[in-house]
Amino acid sequence: MKKNALRIGAVLVSSALLSTLVTPAHAHVSVVPGVSAAGNTTDALTVGRNNTINFRVGHGCSLEKDVIHPKTRRVVASAAIDKFATQAFTVTIPKSAMGEAGATFPRPAFVPGWRTTAKKNEDGSVTIKWRAISNDFALPNGPAGDTGASMYFDFGVRVAFSSATRGQRVSFVAQQTCLVDLPRAKGFPASRLPIYETWDGTADGADTVLDNNSRGPAPTVTVNP
């Protein structure tokens, strides 16, 4: 497990590279500050409205274990080799990043080719989801013909940090979804199997380390005092 810290102005941005027991998952989501409440891209994130943060998805998904076709029992995708494009990305905005008393609804950035939904949860947080409308708009693991390189994209959200977050770390649960194609077989229609990269502050346990849902530290920012 490797961790990186990126300091922009007075904002501390933490990120992590997640590895699995089988092969590095190449999962990397970090938070990059955008525009502060003062409208200045160089200011630290502050309490108030119009703070834009960008969740940078830096890689596609890889596998913790081989994917076996449920009908033919053949290996469809290999944990040691195959990588997959990002088809969906979700992030949960906590109440502490929704203004005083959680009254300011977060505003997601419009991403052409992706559908965006927002759902308010029972605890008052809001989960935002971007989903590619087709494979043509999915975020590939690397440029065509160059499997050794990775592409990235920033999913932006406008938030309002509450006064209780001054000088505090604010974490966001995020999840990246990729799809593995399962070919048609006799008595089995073609389908797609989701695999995940989840950043929620937990780690893979003995019972989950090979479930093709890698886990690691949640992307985090520190609000200016």
Located regions from the model:
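A surface/secretory-pathway sequence property marking extracellular, secreted
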Residues: P94-K129, P219, P225
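Sec/Tat signal peptide C-region and signal peptidase I cleavage site
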Residues: L21-A27
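Low-complexity, intrinsically disordered segments enriched in Ser/Thr together with acidic residues
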Residues: I133-G167
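Bacterial N-terminal signal peptides
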Residues: V11-T20
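Short, solvent-exposed loop/turn segments enriched in Ser/Thr/Gly
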Residues: G48-N54, F153-D154, R169-F172
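Bacterial N-terminal signal peptides that target proteins for export
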Residues: M1-A10
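Low-complexity, serine/threonine/proline/glycine-rich extracellular segments that form mucin-like
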Residues: A44, R49-P106
